[in-house]
From Swiss-Prot:
Source lineage: Eukaryota, Metazoa, Chordata, Craniata, Vertebrata
Glycosylated residues, chain numbering: N132
The keyword Aminoacyl-tRNA synthetase appears for this protein: no
Any one Gene Ontology cellular component term annotated for this protein: extracellular region
GO biological process, one term: defense response to Gram-positive bacterium
Family recorded in the similarity comment: Belongs to the pancreatic ribonuclease family.
Keyword terms: Disulfide bond, Glycoprotein, Secreted, Signal
Cysteine pairings via disulfide bonds: C99-C154, C117-C169, C124-C131
GO molecular function: nucleic acid binding
SMART domains reported for this sequence: RNAse_Pc
Function: Does not exhibit any ribonuclease activity.
Official protein name in the record: Inactive ribonuclease-like protein 9
Domain of life: Eukaryota
Species annotation: Saimiri boliviensis boliviensis (Bolivian squirrel monkey)
């Protein structure tokens, strides 16, 4: 019990210190999106602690978790070379005590992303699993881990992407509907003239 209290309070102080250490210009411009602003509830923080410290299976995704970790608002330029380093730390995108090897941020509304779950299946980038592809072009950033040091100082290279997002989805019993699970890729449109029909299939114009 004592060990849990010490760990909990230490992590809380650590997260508060991170927010204080953010550059002042970032605090002014993007403060409303911070992962643990004052408006967050105690339940949000406890939920984060359970997931971060857990040694068991990863918790199933939720709508709020997807919105918090994947979706971003306009503000910081998507082409900024430090985009991933800033957003990964700000949104606490880690896997337990490790840096994630890759991650995607999408500039879109959750409802639009959720609709993608009901689009036609297409091959994922690994050619094995089935993915759903968006019907519209989406802007986003692909983050690739280049240096893994002690948390939270994970270093990433940022790549701006504009294309069709590939996602996997999972069924959530509580709300009886499909919700986004993982972002598989952002596929840039081909150079030749093309379009997507209503089924999400590429139709090549002559």
């Amino acid at each position: 019990m004592m060990r849990t209290l010490i760990t909990t309070h230490s992590l809380l102080l650590f997260l508060l210190l991170l927010q204080l250490l953010q550059p002042l210009q970032f605090q002014d411009m993007y403060y409303e999106d911070f992962y643990f602003p004052v408006s967050r509830t105690e339940e949000d923080f406890e939920d984060f602690l359970v997931e971060f410290q857990s040694t068991g299976p990863t918790r199933p995704p939720t709508k709020e978790k997807v919105k918090r970790r994947i979706l971003v608002n306009p503000g910081m330029p998507l082409g900024d070379s430090g985009y991933c380093n800033y957003q990964i730390m700000r949104k606490n995108v880690y896997y337990k005590y490790s840096c994630v090897t890759e991650h995607y941020f999408l500039l879109m509304q959750y409802d639009e992303l959720e609709k993608t779950c009901y689009n036609r299946f297409v091959p994922c980038k690994n050619g094995i699993r089935k993915c759903n592809r968006s019907k519209k072009l989406v802007e986003g950033v692909y983050c690739y881990l280049t240096e893994a040091s002690n948390l939270p100082m994970c270093q990433y290279e940022s790549f701006y992407r504009r294309g069709y997002v590939l996602i996997t989805c999972t069924w959530q019993n509580e709300i009886q509907k499909l919700i986004p699970y993982t972002i598989n890729d952002i596929v840039e449109p081909p150079n030749h003239r093309s379009l997507l029909n209503e089924d999400g299939v590429f139709v090549i114009s002559p």
